[in-house]
Each structure stands twice: as C-alpha cells, then as structure tokens.
C-alpha cells in the first residue's frame, strides 16, 4: 500500500467516522466479522471501480478542457451556465442513473473552474441535488426505482407517469433555487489559459472501454468488464490507474458494513416488525427517516420485506435521498469528487431545506392526486 494512499486515509474524516461508528455498533450486536464481506454490495463496488477508471481516463485525456472551453463561450452568464449544468445532470440521470451522471458532470464542472470564475462547490451541490431529483422519474434512474419497479408490475411508461408529479415539483423547485443562488452577472474568464492539448487516442479508447463495460454490466459480467477496463488502462495509460481515488471504495465498504451492523440492532428490528401496521403518514416519515440513516437503497430493500411496492414507498425513499449526506450514495460520490472539505457542511445548507420541502410537497401531492 503506497504512502499517498495511507496519507489520504489519515486525512479522510468521513472514513474515520465510519470506522468509529462500526466499532461502536459492534458492542451491541453479535461480533461476526466473517459475515461482513457478504454485507458489502460488490456489484456496486465493481461498478464504481469501472466508472472511476473511465472518468479519470477522459479527464487525463484533456477532453474535459476542450469541452469546457466550448461551454464557457456559449453561456454568457453564470446563471445560464449553472442552469444548463443542473438540467444536464438531471437529464443524464434519468437514463444513465444518478451515479453515472455525476461521474460525467462533476469532473467537467471542476474543469470549468480553470477557465472562468464560478462557485464550483455550490454548482456541484446543485448537481448532486439535480441527479436525485431527475433520477426519480424513470424506473432505471436509480437503484431504489429499479428494485420497486421490478416488483410493482407497472410498465416503463406507467412508472414514469406515477413519478412525474414529484419529479416535476422537485425540478421546478431546484431550478427556481438555482436561479436565485447563481447571479446573472457576465462570466469572468481567466487570462493566460493555454489552449488545451488533448489525446484523441485516449478519448476513443475510453469510449470503447465504456461500451465494453456497459455491455458487461448488462450481461451480469461486471467483474470481467472491470478486468478488461483495468487491463486496457494498464496498457494504454497506467497513470489513469494510479490517479483514481481508490479510497472512495473503502468508504463505501465501511458504509455497507455499518448499515449491516445497524440493521442487526434489536431495537431497529422491533421497529421494522411494526412497519406494516403504520398509517400512511407514519410509513412516509419512517421511509424518509430510515433513508437519512442508512441511505435510501438499503432502506428500500428492508422495507420491501414488510410493505408492498406502493407509490407512497417509492416517493418516500426518493425524497429520502435529499437531506443528510448518507441519504443517497450519489451525495457521497459528488462531494468526494469535489475534493474540498468545506463542501461537506455547505451541502447540508441546501439539502436539508430541500428534504423538508420535498417531504411536505410530496405528501400533499399524494393526498390531492387521484389514486392509481
């Protein structure tokens, strides 16, 4: 293990917090470390590994610099650029999933900082909120939707129709907030920025490897897909493999183990046993609250054991993606890629009010809209 890798872990406060939480939970549940590897969602870990390699490959190719230069020339004001990036993040998340959308828009946003004066952290926060709002529209936008859609019996179009009111309300709210938080002042460009030199061969290689990886995911052969992607970069551009933030994978592994330990707590098991008897407001608040603690995908998996895949459930777990950092794994991905500690607390200044508003508006819509 390299010294830079160790130094990164030593400075990673969130990872250290997860370790401390895991140690604390171990005192209240049976100590069975042999079961911990099974608690890790290896499909997610492998998928993230491939996406991180591919994104880093495009970044090191210099293509984001080329694309960023074209973008800043097209948008005259900070507000227009921010609105475009938020809409792009939301749109991409509807068919590429929220995580993949972030792996595209966040590196591009970071590149824009070198070309012009923009509040990068604020824009990344809005992009994280945008993929949570946009991805809830379609059955393939995020993992919780995939799970519930598979059990609901709804058609693709039918699922979109039931999610459209909430998605529309959240996107309208986010765009209005974006309009208020990003000024309409003219873009200020950095002087002396050299014309970017990019590597077309590496870009095309990334595109080819991306197609291979997506095909492998489609056929449930994600491990072989990762092997091919890693081998390709090892041969073509070894720097890509060495530049990836591999500590993010350890953070996810620690989160999965902590969630596993948390669900073993007798108190939580007792609460879950009564979920099927809750009223609609009670289930709404329970699903949202549980998502804040263990993330919305594990919450969905747990709750589907006790309640049917209803409209209320799918809306609640998607609303639960806002708020606290653990609400959605997409939040963690976006903030980690920003590589700035200040963004962690600033994120909650926007995300928590968004959660409260989404919980209120979502439940009102459930009450006033005709039942499906």
From Swiss-Prot:
Compartments where found: Cell inner membrane
GO biological process: transmembrane transport
GO cellular component, one term: plasma membrane
This protein's record includes keyword Lipid biosynthesis: no
Transmembrane segments: 14-34, 35-55, 86-106, 123-143, 156-176, 209-229, 248-268, 284-304, 310-330, 349-369
Alphabetically ordered keywords of this record: Cell inner membrane, Cell membrane, Membrane, Transmembrane, Transmembrane helix, Transport
Pfam families: CitMHS
Periplasmic topological segments: 1-13, 56-85, 144-155, 230-247, 305-309, 370-372
Superkingdom of the source species: Bacteria
Membrane-related topology note: Multi-pass membrane protein
Primary localisation category: membrane
Cytoplasmic face of the membrane: 107-122, 177-208, 269-283, 331-348
Annotated family: Belongs to the CitM (TC 2.A.11) transporter family.
PANTHER family named among the record's database cross-references: P PROTEIN
The protein, known as: Inner membrane protein YbiR
Lineage summary: Bacteria, Pseudomonadati, Pseudomonadota, Gammaproteobacteria, Enterobacterales
């Amino acid at each position: 293990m390299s010294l830079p890798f160790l130094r990164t872990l030593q400075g990673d406060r969130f990872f250290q917090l997860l370790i401390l939480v895991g140690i604390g939970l171990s005192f209240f549940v049976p100590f069975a470390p042999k079961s911990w590897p099974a608690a890790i969602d290896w499909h997610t870990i492998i998928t993230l590994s491939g996406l991180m390699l591919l994104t880093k490959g495009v970044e090191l190719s210099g293509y984001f610099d080329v694309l960023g230069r074209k973008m800043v020339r097209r948008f005259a004001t900070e507000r227009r650029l921010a609105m475009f990036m938020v809409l792009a993040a939301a749109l991409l998340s509807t068919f590429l999933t929220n995580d993949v959308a972030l792996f595209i828009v966040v590196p591009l946003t970071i590149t824009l900082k070198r070309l012009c004066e923009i509040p990068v952290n604020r824009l990344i926060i809005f992009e994280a909120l945008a993929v949570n709002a946009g991805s809830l529209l379609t059955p393939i936008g995020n993992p919780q939707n995939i799970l519930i859609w598979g059990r609901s019996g709804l058609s693709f179009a039918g699922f979109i129709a039931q999610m459209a009111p909430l998605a529309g309300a959240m996107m309208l709210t986010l765009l209005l907030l974006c309009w208020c938080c990003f000024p309409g002042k003219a873009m200020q460009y950095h002087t002396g920025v050299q014309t970017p030199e990019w590597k077309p061969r590496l870009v095309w290689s990334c595109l080819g490897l991306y197609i291979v990886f997506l095909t492998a995911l489609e056929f449930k052969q994600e491990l072989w897909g990762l092997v091919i992607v890693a081998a390709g970069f090892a041969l073509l551009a070894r720097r890509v493999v060495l530049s990836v933030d591999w500590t993010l994978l350890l953070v996810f592994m620690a989160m999965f183990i902590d969630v596993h330990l948390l669900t073993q707590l007798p108190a939580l098991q007792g609460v879950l046993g009564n979920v099927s008897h809750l009223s609609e407001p009670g289930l709404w608040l329970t699903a949202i609250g549980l998502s804040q603690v263990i993330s919305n995908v594990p919450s969905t998996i747990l709750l589907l054991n006790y309640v049917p895949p209803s409209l209320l459930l799918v809306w609640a777990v998607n609303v639960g993606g806002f708020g606290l950092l653990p609400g959605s794994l997409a939040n963690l991905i976006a903030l980690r890629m920003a590589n700035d500690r200040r963004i962690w607390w600033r994120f909650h200044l926007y995300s928590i009010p968004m959660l409260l508003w989404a919980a209120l508006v979502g439940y009102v819509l459930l009450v006033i809209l005709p039942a499906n």
